[in-house]
């Protein structure tokens, strides 16, 4: 598979990221013992710049949805960091997530689902979504377990989940997320959804404590700068990313950050680090910042 990266005996295949043209951090991680599908969700926003999605965005959405469904066929375990629809697939018909009930059944069937606690450290909106998901998993006979601060062993592979960290800065109304560390005898890969930098210092410390070979992480949402994301939090995120780049192997920095046309200017110091790349760059593909350029794609610039 052309998009597959290797770190020791761990294979990593990024499936959906903003640099591929969609909202997602879906990733397939394979070790000699277990294959894990991380955050199997994808979405495009109904409105950006007051405009509906361009044709290219719909095409990218379908492409990534197909990638996720194919990856699920290979997976033994599915992990869910939180309950936003770009990070899990609901048992609902949703146009902007390219899913319906059958999509979800095919995705979760016969897999072990390790998920964020649906009742603790969660906001009301995500609690409703979590309840809807777990109820349907139970109806379908799908095994699931709460993963917060727990470890699961599969042969010589260990899946280690973080405590719930804020979805961005401390005190955010967006709730909490889990990070996932996949560890084998000779490599470590870490997936950090929606920590937005990270802004929160304890999240940084958990991410770097074992000096992972690869970190896949969501950058700060600079497209919301001055609206829902402050300059102070951007400075924290930048400082933490610079520190991270010195303490880990490779960094794939993507997701929220790439909804901003000027994302490289916002974090120019970070991208000067030789080990920080987008998901598209990591796999040798051209970046497709479709949401960020929706105005141009729609001829409304």
Residue ranges and their predicted role:
Residues 97, 175, 208, 230-240:
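Charged helix-capping and loop-helix junction motifs
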Residues 232-301:
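Binuclear metal-ion centers of metallo-dependent hydrolases, dominated by the metallo-beta-lactamase
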Residues 22, 83-89, 120-124, 196-201, ...:
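Active-site environment of divalent metal-dependent phosphoester hydrolases
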Residues 93, 202-207, 240, 266:
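A short acidic, amphipathic alpha-helical/loop segment
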Residues 34-35, 107-113, 246-251, 273-274:
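A short helix->loop->beta-strand "cap" motif at the edges of active sites that frequently abuts
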Residues 1-73, 126-202, 288-301:
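Core dinuclear metal-dependent hydrolase active-site scaffold
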Residues 52-114, 205, 209-216, 223-224:
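Active-site metal-binding motif and surrounding structural segment of the metallo-beta-lactamase
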